[in-house]
């Protein structure tokens, strides 16, 4: 206690406090944590684009509200409702009236679909592994998104009012969609390829609006994120199991010069890099819960969840994921407690000594042999090629889906992955597309930081910091992989960003 008191009154602590106070008043702080003029509620409500959009949605909603009002007026006197009242759930047979399942079904709302979206990694694997799933395995997430976007306004209409939350992301999303539409019509040599390529960018950001509007209270929020942490724990345990048994992997996953590396884990995801990115997203969330746990038992639980996830992240041997995790921890330390940066430094120093595989992977990355190999036929060569392709059409690029990603690999002969989502975007959509995407992503981080700064609950503020750290890690990982081409990762990114935006509005 005396050491803590001495630190509180020491010159370094006072200097740190003064620096923190000055930083909170600085222009840089306002840039990241403030609210842009275009994103303030009055600016959004009075802007021409939002007024036009509100008029259009209002015109479409009026008939829906009228129909819902008629249904509400008719229901009290209906024969069906009278029959249900006479033979309601409480008057039903004991087997049914006492059924947890039956009562859960009665309480279902559109918000319940969030459990399915948060379970994306599990549902997607189950459907793809299930015999006879067919096209459902490829389209289930789109069908779920369409269902939510249709059922949500219907539910609001039946409740008597159609409304939605305005967020600082509304105008940046509209701007990006406008730029994407312009580029689509300007550069689409093959419409089917362009549609598939544009879908990678435009479709999944709709999950932002689903999360920002359907998250209603703190209990729902905490339950969903605890479930996500539990999912991450199971995935981590499975990854550790794969490492123990030495799961076989394709030879291309290991460079010929790394003979000591025998396996890389991928769990149910199918790719070590994508598994690493998923864990980068979840680990800071679990860490935030551990640090803000209300009691010792809860802290031990979250630390137990962190252990297999961290081990599995190491065993992916994904250098890009390690870099992303380092950046995510640094962001969380800056947001939650700057003293964690010292712990991060110690961990970065000790990790290569504790796990020799880390030292060999990072050491090989810095070796002349790797740089020569990468420049000849590896990642650096693909990056240079992407820049050459961009130079053919600097402003608008080659067109959506025509270079550097999964869509191009399926449809364009000779196309390879760029292993850099931003260079892929530059090659496909030019300066216009990359600038619009950069503005969108930076606006998303600013929206999240602004929401975090408005929270008064320390536990929620810590959780928001963990989510923001994970999101930042995924953005960093996109610099060396095409992470946003994976529907699961893009869905989780926009879903969690929408969740942070909703946090200041959550009810008790």
Named regions from a protein language model:
Residues 93-104, 118, 144-159, 282-293, ...:
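Hydrophobic, aromatic-rich transmembrane alpha-helices
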Residues 177-184, 206, 222-261, 267-335, ...:
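Alpha-helical transmembrane segments of multi-pass inner-membrane proteins
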Residues 253, 363-384, 388-429, 450, ...:
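Long extracytoplasmic/lumenal interhelical loops at the membrane interface
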Residues 10, 17, 24, 30, ...:
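N-terminal signal-anchor transmembrane segment
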Residues 104-111, 153-172, 289-305, 333-343, ...:
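Membrane-interface helix-loop-helix junctions at transmembrane boundaries of multi-pass membrane enzymes
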Residues 137-154, 198-207, 275-283, 323-330, ...:
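Membrane-embedded alpha-helical segments of multi-pass membrane proteins
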Residues 118, 147-150, 339-346, 458, ...:
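Transmembrane alpha-helices of multi-pass inner-membrane enzymes
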Residues 140-143, 148, 168-178, 191-213, ...:
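Aromatic-anchored transmembrane helix interface
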């Amino acid at each position: 206690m005396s050491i803590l008191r001495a630190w509180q009154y020491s010159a370094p602590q006072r200097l740190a406090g003064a620096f923190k106070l000055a930083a909170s008043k600085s222009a840089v702080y306002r840039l990241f944590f403030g609210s842009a003029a275009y994103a303030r509620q009055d600016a959004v409500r009075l802007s021409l684009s939002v007024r036009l959009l509100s008029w259009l949605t209002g015109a479409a909603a009026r008939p829906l509200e009228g129909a819902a009002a008629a249904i509400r007026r008719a229901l009290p006197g209906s024969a069906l409702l009278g029959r249900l009242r006479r033979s309601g759930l409480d008057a039903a047979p004991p087997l049914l009236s006492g059924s947890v399942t039956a009562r859960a079904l009665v309480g279902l709302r559109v918000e319940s679909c969030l459990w399915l979206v948060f379970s994306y990694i599990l549902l997607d694997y189950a459907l793809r592994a299930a015999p006879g799933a067919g096209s459902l395995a490829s389209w289930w997430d789109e069908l779920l998104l369409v269902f939510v976007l249709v059922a949500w306004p219907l539910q609001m209409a039946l409740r008597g009012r159609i409304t939605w939350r305005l967020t600082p992301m509304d105008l940046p999303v509209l701007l990006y969609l406008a730029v994407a539409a312009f580029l689509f019509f300007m550069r689409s040599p093959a419409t089917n390829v362009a549609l598939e390529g544009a879908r990678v960018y435009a479709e999944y950001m709709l999950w932002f609006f689903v999360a920002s509007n359907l998250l209603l209270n703190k209990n729902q929020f905490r339950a969903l994120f605890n479930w996500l942490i539990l999912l991450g724990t199971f995935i981590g345990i499975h990854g550790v199991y794969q490492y123990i048994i030495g799961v076989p992997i394709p030879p291309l996953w290991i460079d010929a010069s790394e003979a000591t590396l025998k396996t890389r884990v991928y769990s149910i995801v199918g790719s070590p890099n994508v598994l690493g990115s998923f864990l980068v997203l979840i680990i800071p969330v679990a860490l935030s819960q551990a640090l803000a746990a209300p009691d010792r038992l809860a802290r031990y639980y979250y630390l137990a969840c962190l252990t297999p996830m961290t081990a599995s992240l190491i065993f992916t041997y994904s250098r890009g994921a390690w870099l992303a995790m380092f950046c995510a921890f640094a962001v969380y330390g800056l947001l939650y407690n700057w003293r964690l940066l010292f712990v991060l430094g110690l961990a970065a120093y000790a990790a290569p000594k504790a796990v020799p595989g880390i030292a060999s992977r990072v050491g090989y990355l810095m070796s002349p042999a790797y740089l020569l190999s990468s420049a000849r036929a590896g990642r650096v060569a693909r990056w240079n090629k992407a820049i050459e392709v961009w130079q053919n059409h600097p402003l608008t690029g080659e067109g959506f889906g025509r270079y550097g990603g999964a869509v191009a690999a399926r449809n364009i002969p000779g196309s390879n992955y760029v292993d850099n989502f931003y260079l892929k975007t530059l090659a496909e959509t030019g300066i216009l597309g990359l600038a619009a995407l950069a503005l969108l992503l930076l606006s998303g981080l600013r929206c999240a930081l602004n929401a975090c700064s408005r929270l008064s609950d320390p536990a929620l503020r810590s959780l928001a910091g963990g989510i923001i750290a994970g999101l930042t890690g995924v953005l960093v990982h996109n610099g060396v992989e095409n992470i946003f081409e994976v529907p699961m990762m893009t869905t989780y990114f926009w879903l969690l960003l929408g969740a942070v935006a909703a946090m200041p509005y959550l009810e008790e």
